[in-house]
Each structure stands twice: as structure tokens, then as C-alpha cells.
Amino acid sequence: MSCIQIISSSQTSIAGHRKLCNKLFTLRTQEGFETDILRALNIILTVKKGNSNADRVLRFLVTFVNYLQQKDPEIDIVQPILKHILRGLDAKDKTVRYRCCQIIARVVNCVKEIDDDLYNTLKEKLLSRVLDRESIVRLEAVVALSRLQEDTGDEENDVRNILLFLLQNDPSSEVRRSVLLNIEVSNSTLPFILERARDVDAANRKCVYARVLPKIGDFRYLSIKKRVRILKWGLNDRDESVEKAAADMLAYQWIENADNNLLELLERLDVSNNSDVAVLAIKKFFDVRVDSLSQLEFPEQFWLELTAESSLLARTFNEICIEKNYTDLLDKMPEVVQLTYYIERQYVSLRDKSSYDESCFIIEQLLYIGLSQDMVDEIGRRKLLKSLTNSLSTMALPDSLISLHIELLRKLCSSENDFCSLLVEIITEVFEQGHSQNQTEEQGNSNAPELNKNDYEGEEITVSQKSPSPSLPPNELNEPEPDDMDGYKEAFNELRCLSYVQCLFENITSSLNENLYMVDMLKTLIIPAVRSHDLPIREKGLECLSLVCLLNADLAFENVPLYLHCYEKGSVVLKCTAIRTLTDMLIQHGKAKFTEYEDAISSILFEALGEFENAELQTLGAEAIAKLLVILHYRDELFLKPLIIQYFEPNTVDNHALRQVLGYFFPVYAFGAHENQWRIATIFCDALLSLLEIYRDLDEDDVQLSIGHIAQQMLDWTDNEKLYERKTQTGDDYIALNHNVHLHLANMIFESLPNASEGKERKFMISLLGKLKIPTDLPSSDYQRTKRKLETYESHGFTMDSTSLSILAKFERMLLQNEEARSKFEETEEERLMENAEENEHAGAEAISGEIIPDTVEANMEDEEEVYVKQEEDL
């Protein structure tokens, strides 16, 4: 067999490639051997992607090159092949460029050494091909170029830099995946690789967890921040395959790196600062390794030597057992009496400043366990209640523990009234501890009030007007004056009491008028705090007042001016509190209650939405408006256009929170109700013209999103086929909702065209007509109305280019065809109805003329006549 015949035989099957390699190897010394190899490659170059025969031939040739290098290294066939194929990298035919890159990628992989000149030529050519306009060419060029990577820390590494650029910016997900799999992992490339865990393509995200991260080896090479971020992204991914890949990586590879010790793995995640991710990681771990759950044991010594990691593991184990209904495994959890003892042990540990944070974290996990207990043990319930009450009264706990203590306290109390009574006693005791008797006498009023439900006439509480000074280094601290210390203690005590009050109102639902304790709290603590000159106290007081306002509509109405004033004159924190409170009050009590303040509330929401210098406040304003529109339809016509503009506004491109809020809001709003979709269509043109004006003044480098993409997104919101309820029933028929929304949109476009600037903007608005979905079964009057608007626009005599004229002519023909078809249908339908009416009328007349009186009716008439005659005779 000749060389060409052997190569031709390789296209039938891969199974015989080894034998064919041996046969071809015997011909290596023949004259023209190299030429035959190149001829075979030339044939492959013109074969399009997907041809299995060409792929098998190429695979055979690569196998032979590798085989030849092993058997006879003196024969160099690689250099001639590469030099020959390099000539085709600049070909006009995309198939040739694709095959050339593919051959280079396969052949270079077989080479251990390469000539410097050839290396530089290859690199130069491939650097241009990775930017090819065809994605299939870029894909193979990336594979080929990755073989030329140099393991250097030089920032001027051209190959690495271009691969990183493609990894971040290439529009093709397959090209990005190719870079991801082929780029070398190093300190300089690792951040870009991990970034692909947030890729828009699910296959790429899965690739990070299933193929790239295992190549790194021990996860401890990653920083704690990177470990937590990787787990958070993967385990929360919306795609099930990505989530499973991340869970498998955790449950098999990472646990193996931690010597199959779950506690050691948790130690590497810094659970004290990343408890949410750690809890999720444990749950996913046991989802994959279900058998390991029953193997966990919690002996007495475990509870006596709790750490942050072990306490979190116990809490998560308890939650899993409850969620999965593993009642037999729940027996491993301690009883309420034992749990109380373990909590009290950690209270003692709080005295040690070195372990304070860890002890707080452990107490938090034990309280979570307590929240899930059934509390049927009355002795245990009382002990735990006493322990929590004592800790709240005597210890300065962080806010996170205060909220959990009070939440558990609410569960332990039999009724809401008992809960309020108990917590009022605790607050009274805490308040008295922070105010000395001497201070009370000097002030001459009841500064430490007895919070009694029979006493509402107490004076306002006053606190020091001195704000705590900024912290200083230890060597610069001076001994504070006694008066200053008293002021600090009072302010701190006030904040502590207000934290208790805030948690109290967060855990009750009864009306303000039904609970006298709440009225007491309002008068003696909250109102004085709102009037305080200490900013932290005033902020906390306003938060507490907002919770009270949610329980009483009249109180909410009375305090609207206060929160409006807070927004106008207050700090950023107060502005955020004001927006949240006003929004919650509108949602809770209804917009009808606050009609008087509609303009004022709308004004501050507008102002917040335009706060470009404060991203948090701007996001909060957008979120508040979005809630009001979805839930209450609060002044849709006023807020909808500004929201759309802010969503696409170039200045908000870095405000990711705002984009996320609005990105969720618009589909929910548009597809949730057909009325909302109609509103979007109504303001479509006004919003788009405003955006055109904004984008007109931008430089090309500042444009993040083209106006065409913006219009396409807005058109998608007006697609009636995506409505949650697409049809409504009227009688026995179903009518499609918003069936004519795009015809309505066409009317709005014609009305807005005179307002658009001549040239590109007007041409762009006209081009939208070709993207509308106009149904053919609307009433003919609808088409006539749109046609009249088109004729009105044409009568203005605006100058238009040929493309715009063509679009308008095509749209007009479509309207005429639909109108004529529907007119004929309506005439036919009208004639049919008239015929049916005439037939029914004729049938009714025949029935009346041929009607016969029944015998029973005649008999009744005769009886009535006889009775009448008899009555006359009697008279």
C-alpha cells in the first residue's frame, strides 16, 4: 500500500490506526513520503467542521507523528508540517483557518522542543487568530496558543495576557471554556480562573468546579476569602449541575484534603465570620454523603469542649434532622435542661476577653438549637426561661445575641401578653442599673420610670447630649472625667434598652391599643429617644418608632411628617430609615390612608432614586418604588419611566445592587399583570427617547449597552405571550390578554416620531415597527386607527431615508391587508348573524300562528264562566 492509500484507510475506523501506523512507519524513508503527508493535510483543510472522516484522518496523522517521534527521533516531520500549515492561517476561507489552527494545536502537543524562529512565527500568527471573527477559529487557536505558554512571572507575557483577555471578554462561551481548561494555573491567573465561577454560561461554571479546581490540588492553597467565595457561588448556583459539581468537590476532594475530618474542614472556612456559607456547606455535604450523617456522635465531652466549628456542626445537624424528619437522630441532641447548662457555661466564658467572640458565636448556635426544641419539658422550660432572663438583665450582649435571646424568650412564654410583661420588667431593671439614684434626684424627674401599665404620665427621659468620641490608641487615652463617664454609661444603657424594645416589637403582632405595655414603652423610651440629641440614640429610637407605626395606622399617619423631616434634614442612615419606614407603612396600612402625603412621599422617593453619589440610598429608593408598584400600583404613571431610565442609565453601571433590584422587578411587574404590560407599552416611546438623548452625548468608550439592545429588552417586556395569565374567560370563550399591545405600541411610535431628532434617532424609532408582533385577528377599526396615525405622520413631510420609507411602506401594506381581511370577515359574520336572526324570527311567527289552545285550558275557562254566572244568581 502507498502512503496515500494508508492514510485514506484511516478514515473508516479508529480501531485499526495502530496497525496503519506500523505500515506507514515502514514507508518513512521512501521518496515523496513527506509530500504525501502534506497532500493529505491539504485535503483536510477544505473539509468543514463536523466531518467525522476528516477528523479520523487528522487523528491518525497526529498519532503517527507521535509514533514516529518515539520510534525514530532523527526524522523530523513536525517542522515541515508546521511551516506548511502556517501558510493557511491567513486564508480567506474560515474553514481553512479553522483546520490550520486545529492541526497546529494537535501537532504542537506532540513536540517536546521547537525551533526559536518557528516558535516566534507560530506565536505571532496564533495571537492574531485568537482574535478571529469566527468563534470556531478562535477556539482552536486558543488550544494551539496554550501549548506555547511560558511559565514566567513576567507581566509582559503576551500569550498569558491574551488568554486572560479572552477568558474575560470573548463572547463565545466555548472559547472561554477552552481558555479555562488550557491556561496554566498560577498566582497571576488564579483570580481570573475563579472569576469564571460567575460566568453567564452554566457549563463554564460547572467546569470550574468539576475540572479546574481539582487541578489546583489542596484547597488550602487558596486564601480563606477565596474558599468562602467559591463555595458561596457554587452551592447557591441556580443551575443544578453546577450546584452538584460544587457539592461533589466539597464532599469528596476538599474533605479528603482535610484528612476526612469535617471539623478540620470547617476550621479552614473561618466559620465565625462566614457562618451562612459554612451552614450551607455542611448541609450540601450531608446531601451528598448521607451515610455520614448517622455516624455523627455527640457525647457529653463534645458539649463540654465546644468550639465555634463543633457548635456550628451541632446546630446544622439539628436543622438537617428537623428538615428531613430524622426523628431517630434527633435523640442525639441534648434535652432542654442540659442545653441550659451548656449555655450557662458559655456565659461564664464571656468574662475571658480573649475568647469573647468565640463564646458569643457558640451561644448563638446553642440558641438556634433551643429555638427548634419542642419545650414539652416544663422544668427545662422554666430553667431556660430563668437563664435567658438573667442574662438579658445582667449582661451586655451583642445585638445578634439579644435578638436570639428575645426570640427564644417569646417561644418560652405562653402568651404575647406574658412575653411583653416579662420583657418590660427586664428593660426596667436594665434601665435602673444604668441610672444612679443621685442623678435621678438632681434631674428632679422620673428618669428611671416604673414601666407600669397603670401609669402613662411619666416625664420624658433625657440623656446626655455628649456623643462618644472616636476611639484613640491606648497610649493616647486619657482618664475620662467622671461626668463624661456618666454620659457614656447613660448613652450606652439607653441604646441597650432600645435594642430590647426593638426586638420586643419585632416579635409581637397585637395592636397597639390591645397591649398597654407597648403604650408605656412608646411614652417612656421611644419618644424621648427620638427627641435625643445623641445621633445613635435618635437613630435607634426612629427604628423602634417605625415598628410601632406598623402596628397602628393612626400613629403611622401622625408620624409621616417626622420621617419626611428625617429624610430632608437627617444623615444617610436616617434617610434610609425614613424611606424604609414610609414604604412599609404604605404597604401595611394601604395608600388610601396617606393620600394627603402622596406628593411629599413621591418627592423623596424621586430624590433618592437620583442619588448617584450614594449608591446605597439610590438602591433603597429603587427598591421602595419597585415594592410600591408591584404591591400597591402606587402612582405607576409617575414612577415607571424614571425606573426604566435609571435601569439603563450609564451612570448606574457600577451600582450592581440597583441593577439587580430592577433586573428582578421589571419581568415580575411586566408579566405579572396585563395592565402593567400595557402601562410599559404606553411609556415605551417617552422612555426610549429620553435614553436616546442621554446616550447621544456619550463617548463610544462610555457606552456599556447599545440603544438597540435596550429597545429589544423593552420590547420583550411587552410580549403578551410571556404573561403569567395569557387568557381570560368571558362566557364560554377565552380571550387573549393584551392581544393588541404591539398595535398600541405602534400607535405610540407614530405619535412620538415628530418629537424624535431627525436622522439616526427617527430612523431607529421607525425600525422598531419591523420588530412588532401584530396579530391578524383584531377588529378592523384598530387597523384603521393605526393607519390614520401613519398617514398623519406622513402628511408632515419629514425627510426619510430609503430604509425608513421601505419599513413604513411594508407596515402600511400589512395594515391594509389585515384591515381588508378583517372587514370581509366581519361583513360575512354580520350577514350570518342577520340570517340567523331572520330564521329565528320566521320560526317564531309560525309558532304563534299555528298555536292550539290545550283542552285543559278550555276546561278551566268554562269553569270560570259557570262560577261567574252562579255568583250573579246569588246576588
From Swiss-Prot:
Signal peptide location: none
One GO term (biological process): mitotic chromosome condensation
Amino acid composition bias (Basic and acidic residues), ranges on this chain: 831-844
The entry's keywords: Cell cycle, Cell division, Chromosome, Cytoplasm, DNA condensation, Mitosis, Nucleus, Repeat
Subcellular location: Nucleus; Cytoplasm; Chromosome
HEAT repeats, residue ranges: 55-76, 77-113, 117-154, 157-192, 222-259, 379-418, 516-554, 556-591, 740-778
Classification via Pfam families: Cnd3
GO cellular component, one term: cytosol
Region (Disordered) residue spans: 459-485, 831-875
Cell division listed as a keyword: yes
Chief localization: nucleus
Disulphide bridges: none
Subunit: Component of the condensin complex, which contains the cut14/smc2 and cut3/smc2 heterodimer, and three non SMC subunits that probably regulate the complex: cnd1, cnd2 and cnd3.
Annotated family: Belongs to the CND3 (condensin subunit 3) family.
Function in brief: Regulatory subunit of the condensin complex, a complex required for conversion of interphase chromatin into mitotic-like condense chromosomes. The condensin complex probably introduces positive supercoils into relaxed DNA in the presence of type I topoisomerases and converts nicked DNA into positive knotted forms in the presence of type II topoisomerases. The condensin complex probably also plays a role during interphase.
Name of this chain's protein: Condensin complex subunit 3
Organism (species): Schizosaccharomyces pombe (strain 972 / ATCC 24843)
